[in-house]
């Protein structure tokens, strides 16, 4: 983040890197637990793994207070409009992590008539976490991958 330190004690950096550093250190996730993957998501937030070390400390119940949605579990056709409505209520910038085989592509229930074959058909997904169910470590790795993606974005439009 810091490009240069001058002898007078000044630190030089770009506006993009400061803003992106702040964004990565203060992710506010919103739970959208739909099945057994939600148990692993709660496990990741508990004391053993402590998501607070990675900047995703407090899970929010309101979409207006969150900028990260973790879709964990099987998304059925009846739940898809609710998922989209909650996503639309989130403030910009917003990110989505698809957690588990069912959220990624339907999983075990892929050929069922009532299951959406991937939540990316409803909302844009930034990071996919594989597994059935994925471990808490896999979710933490997915959050770290999202933080790296955020660091590469540009806040100021380039000419």
UniProtKB/Swiss-Prot annotation:
<keyword id="KW-0813">Transport</keyword>
<dbReference type="GO" id="GO:0048038">
    <property type="term" value="F:quinone binding"/>
</dbReference>
<comment type="function">
    <text>NDH-1 shuttles electrons from NADH, via FMN and iron-sulfur (Fe-S) centers, to quinones in the respiratory chain. The immediate electron acceptor for the enzyme in this species is believed to be ubiquinone. Couples the redox reaction to proton translocation (for every two electrons transferred, four hydrogen ions are translocated across the cytoplasmic membrane), and thus conserves the redox energy in a proton gradient.</text>
</comment>
<dbReference type="GO" id="GO:0005886">
    <property type="term" value="C:plasma membrane"/>
</dbReference>
<comment type="subunit">
    <text>NDH-1 is composed of 14 different subunits. Subunits NuoB, C, D, E, F, and G constitute the peripheral sector of the complex.</text>
</comment>
<keyword id="KW-0997">Cell inner membrane</keyword>
<keyword id="KW-0004">4Fe-4S</keyword>
<keyword id="KW-0874">Quinone</keyword>
<dbReference type="GO" id="GO:0009060">
    <property type="term" value="P:aerobic respiration"/>
</dbReference>
<keyword id="KW-0411">Iron-sulfur</keyword>
<dbReference type="Pfam" id="PF01058">
    <property type="entry name" value="Oxidored_q6"/>
</dbReference>
<dbReference type="InterPro" id="IPR006138">
    <property type="entry name" value="NADH_UQ_OxRdtase_20Kd_su"/>
</dbReference>
<comment type="similarity">
    <text>Belongs to the complex I 20 kDa subunit family.</text>
</comment>
<protein>
    <recommendedName>
        <fullName>NADH-quinone oxidoreductase subunit B</fullName>
        <ecNumber>7.1.1.-</ecNumber>
    </recommendedName>
</protein>
<dbReference type="GO" id="GO:0051539">
    <property type="term" value="F:4 iron, 4 sulfur cluster binding"/>
</dbReference>
<dbReference type="InterPro" id="IPR006137">
    <property type="entry name" value="NADH_UbQ_OxRdtase-like_20kDa"/>
</dbReference>
<keyword id="KW-0479">Metal-binding</keyword>
<dbReference type="GO" id="GO:0008137">
    <property type="term" value="F:NADH dehydrogenase (ubiquinone) activity"/>
</dbReference>
<keyword id="KW-0472">Membrane</keyword>
<dbReference type="GO" id="GO:0045271">
    <property type="term" value="C:respiratory chain complex I"/>
</dbReference>
<keyword id="KW-1278">Translocase</keyword>
<feature type="binding site">
    <location>
        <position position="37"/>
    </location>
    <ligand>
        <name>[4Fe-4S] cluster</name>
    </ligand>
</feature>
<dbReference type="GO" id="GO:0050136">
    <property type="term" value="F:NADH:ubiquinone reductase (non-electrogenic) activity"/>
</dbReference>
<feature type="binding site">
    <location>
        <position position="132"/>
    </location>
    <ligand>
        <name>[4Fe-4S] cluster</name>
    </ligand>
</feature>
<keyword id="KW-0520">NAD</keyword>
<feature type="binding site">
    <location>
        <position position="36"/>
    </location>
    <ligand>
        <name>[4Fe-4S] cluster</name>
    </ligand>
</feature>
<keyword id="KW-0408">Iron</keyword>
<feature type="binding site">
    <location>
        <position position="102"/>
    </location>
    <ligand>
        <name>[4Fe-4S] cluster</name>
    </ligand>
</feature>
<dbReference type="GO" id="GO:0005506">
    <property type="term" value="F:iron ion binding"/>
</dbReference>
<keyword id="KW-1003">Cell membrane</keyword>
<dbReference type="GO" id="GO:0015990">
    <property type="term" value="P:electron transport coupled proton transport"/>
</dbReference>
<keyword id="KW-0830">Ubiquinone</keyword>
């Amino acid at each position: 983040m810091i490009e240069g330190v001058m002898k007078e004690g000044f630190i030089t950096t770009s506006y993009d890197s400061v803003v992106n550093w702040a964004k990565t250190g203060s992710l506010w996730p919103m739970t959208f637990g739909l099945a057994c993957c939600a148990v692993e998501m709660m496990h990741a937030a508990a004391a053993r793994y402590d998501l607070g070390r990675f900047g995703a400390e407090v899970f929010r119940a309101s979409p207006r207070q969150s900028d990260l949605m973790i879709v964990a579990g099987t998304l059925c056709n009846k739940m898809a409009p609710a998922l989209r409505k909650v996503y639309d209520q989130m403030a910009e910038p917003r990110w989505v992590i698809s957690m588990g085989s069912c959220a990624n592509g339907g999983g075990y229930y892929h050929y069922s008539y009532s299951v959406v074959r991937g939540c990316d058909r409803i909302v844009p997904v930034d990071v996919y976490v594989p597994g059935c169910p994925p471990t808490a470590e896999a979710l933490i790795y997915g959050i770290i991958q999202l933080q790296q993606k955020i660091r590469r974005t540009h806040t100021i439009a380039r000419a």
